[in-house]
């Protein structure tokens, strides 16, 4: 019998669509993980629509929920997964919870998507309050084992700009020195020999071999861009990286290939369905571009590798 692997996922929840916990829970369950989800917000839909309604969980409410788990001795976890957070006190409470869970299980792996902002047309901007950045740098990242920043977030966390692959590798080394053993820059605008229609994923993993010396594995993936705005892809990426690094703990190349290939299959299915719904020459709406997660169940379970990683 396969050993149970339990994940505490603290992320947003939407009634309709797939972001945050909704983008992470189903795929992880399909891959055999037990998911305990704390919904940091409960919204009708993601905020890319014209309207949304809902409630936001505050740090006291998060503490109360965790206290219920603790009192029942249900705070033994193998993984913690966190994503988008807007509130400084909520983030500080997440740090307290992860620290306590690591005391309960020193082998717990904390997977953090440090959602801070992104680049549009080469210009970066933050979409969370700026006072969250020092909390991420000083408390969250040092506690994390796996982080999945985009290029702009990696630049913010390291205080360094990235203009080349060499600079990206140096930034990843800086992020390793802050704590995490695995750093994956999930998208960057570095040049690709395949043309301007590609974005670059870079990964770096620090491991100890049986002799005790440190081994580094670095990978690069050139991924063709899709001409559409999807929401929830970063949440799905972090969840799939959790799953595939668990299943391939000493092979970042395979873990990233399976993660990126899963996203490829989900996005291709989504864009095909969205275009069919929108009709010829009409740009699909946010509702039509919601990730086709359930329809992609087989691809999530056993993704055909369609994007190869290069070992650097």
Swiss-Prot record:
Q: Name one GO molecular function term.
A: magnesium ion binding
Highest taxon in the source lineage: Eukaryota
- Residues the entry annotates as binding pyridoxal 5'-phosphate: 47, 234-235
Q: Where is the active site?
A: 235 (proton acceptor)
Binding positions for pyridoxal per the UniProt entry = 12, 47
Q: Which residues carry this modification: N-acetylmethionine?
A: 1
| Record keyword Magnesium present | yes
One GO BP annotation is: pyridoxal 5'-phosphate salvage
Q: What is its main location?
A: cytoplasm
Q: What reactions does this protein catalyze?
A: pyridoxal + ATP = pyridoxal 5'-phosphate + ADP + H(+); pyridoxamine + ATP = pyridoxamine 5'-phosphate + ADP + H(+); pyridoxine + ATP = pyridoxine 5'-phosphate + ADP + H(+)
Where located?
Cytoplasm, Cytosol
- Tissue-wise expression: Ubiquitous. Highly expressed in testis.
Tell me what induces its expression. Transcriptionally regulated by Sp1 transcription factor.
Residues annotated as signal peptide = none
Cofactor (UniProt): Mg(2+); Zn(2+); Co(2+); Mn(2+)
Q: In which pathway does it act?
A: Cofactor metabolism; pyridoxal 5'-phosphate salvage; pyridoxal 5'-phosphate from pyridoxal: step 1/1; Cofactor metabolism; pyridoxal 5'-phosphate salvage; pyridoxine 5'-phosphate from pyridoxine: step 1/1; Cofactor metabolism; pyridoxal 5'-phosphate salvage; pyridoxamine 5'-phosphate from pyridoxamine: step 1/1
Q: Which residues participate in Mg(2+) binding?
A: 118
Q: How does activity depend on pH?
A: Optimum pH is 5.5-6.0.
Q: Where does ATP bind?
A: 113, 150-153, 186-187, 226-228, 233
Tell me what this protein is called. Answer: Pyridoxal kinase
* Source organism of this protein record: Homo sapiens (Human)
- Report the gene name: PDXK
